[in-house]
Structures are given as structure tokens and as C-alpha cells.
Amino acid sequence: MGAEPTAEREYVAEPDVGRLFSLDSLVRLSDALPSSYWRLDGVARALQDAATEDWEDCGIVTDALWLARRTSFRRVGPWPVIYDRLRLTTFCAGVGAAWAERRTNIYVGDQLVIEAASLWVPVDPRGFPVRIPATFHEIFGEAMKGRRVSGRVPVTLPPDGAARRPWPLRRADLDVIGHVNNAAVWQAVAEVFDAPVESVDVIHHGPVEEGHEVELVTSGDTMWLVVDGEVRVTASIVGDVVHDARR
């Protein structure tokens, strides 16, 4: 039997058994700030690419898609800058009834610089949740080592007096089921928070879809995407990095 589900963010170590998948990448011009630092939405896009490549490579045949429910990452080394060559190593770190946690480590050379943990939910082509197939456990189960994770996510509401402005959606933001893509949501995060940061946590409480009139709400170290008064996305950071050995 696995451990009881955990609700807190935890960055478990890379397993010594089971499936690990690695992908090489680069901090490209399109993902770098004027300061040369890797933008937050660029990090999120790389994490999504690694997850997609791993899923396509694993051999499971299904029409299910995976949607991000929560993505967190923290800085553990110098923040990457433009043209840094990256290696992303990813693995499944635990499951629940209808969700799974993916851990990804990002390296520059041999140095671990960012640790990430993402909660993903499988859905059918219409966007409805489905259960994780048995073949998933056959391929990814050994690396999980019986760990169970909770699907619950915390909810915070904007305070009175928080700054508000429209956040127009573009057709380029939409994915194949009509939701605003995870990486596109992170563009709103990057609009509010510059990299580098010590850590960041983004939670999807509900979909943002074509036709929605979205408000971008900010207060201190937290931002929200709000539709018709309902929080759909929450993002929070822990402190800007003031001193970095690379700069």
C-alpha cells in the first residue's frame, strides 16, 4: 500500500528505478526577457513539451488528453539565461484516482537549476475527466514507488482593492478542446511576475475558454484570472531573486 495522499507541494527525488525520460532544449530568443533571463512562461512551455514527449514515447494508445491542474517549480541553482542548453528529466511521482503527478528536473550542463511538480488530469476529447488506464501503472508505476497524491488544490480569493484589468484572449491561446492552453495561461503570469523567482505555483480551478471575458487581478505576490466573478486560475510567487551568481 502507498502512503496517504499529500496536499502540500513536495519535490521528490529522481527515482533509482522505473521510467525516466529526458529531453534536450534551449532557452531561445522568443522565451527570454530583456534581462536575458528565461521567462516563466518559457519554463512552463518546456515542462509541457517534456510531458508531451514522454507521453507520446511511452507507447500507451488512447484518445485521452492531459490537462494541467497545478504546476509548481522552484529555483535550486542559477536561473537559466538565453542560449543556455537545457536537459529536462521527467518521471511520474504519484497518482490518485483520476490524476497523476509529474516531476521534472531542469539541468544546465550537469547542474540542477529548477525542480518542478505538476498535477495532471486525463480527459476525453470533449474535456470530461477519465480514469487512469491500467497500462499507465504498468509503464510508470515502478518510478512512483507506491506514492499517492491528492487532487485537492487550495483556493484563495482576491482581496478588496486588488488591481483589475481586462485580459483579452487570442485564438492562438486555444488548445484542441477549446481551452486556453496551459502555457498561454503562463503568459499572464509572466506579464505580472518577472523571472527569476525563488518559486512559483499556478493552480487551474476551472477552464478559461474561447469567448470568456477574463479579468487579470493582482495583489502583492498573487494574481488571479477571473471569469464572471469566478476565479479560474491562481498564481503566486515567493520572492524575486535579487542576487544571482550568473549575473
Give each language-model segment a name.
Residues 2-70, 117, 122-198, 246-247:
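Hot-dog-fold acyl-thioester-processing enzymes
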